[in-house]
Amino acid sequence: MFDVLVYLYENYWQPDACPDHRQLSRKLSAVGFENEEIEDALSWLDGLATAAESHSGEQSAHALRVYSPMEQEHLGEASIGFVSFLESAGVLRAPMREMVIDRAMAIPAGPLAVEDLKIIVLMVFWSLGEEPDALILDELFVDDEDRLIH
């Protein structure tokens, strides 16, 4: 499913640029994605659109997010740490954070790998028609294993 999401991000500027589900499904199938993977991704994207509508409100700058035990188990320490990093860097506003958590909880298996969470964060930006800052974009695309430490 994550491969399909990355393909959509790389090939369509915004969700509005995507064709309807039926046509998009055919295109993705022609590119070589499996039907189950396509259906999972399209269903996940529908949930993302719903999350965008329901998490549009503002929260106080001093609000503190407390993760439920189920969220802690499903997301894992590394993913929660990454979300906190993005928040403290001022990149992820509270409504976007809630969208990320909502969509991460929609992934069946846990704990969620940070690499998968990065794709979710990228797709949240994409769904809102926003481009993350260049350094954050680099952080979302580059694996830690590929980094050179000076």
UniProtKB/Swiss-Prot annotation:
InterPro entries in UniProt: Smg
Pfam families cross-referenced by the UniProt entry: DUF494
Family of the protein in this entry: Belongs to the Smg family.
Protein's name in the database: Protein Smg homolog
Species name: Methylibium petroleiphilum (strain ATCC BAA-1232 / LMG 22953 / PM1)
Taxonomic lineage: Bacteria, Pseudomonadati, Pseudomonadota, Betaproteobacteria, Burkholderiales
The encoding gene: smg
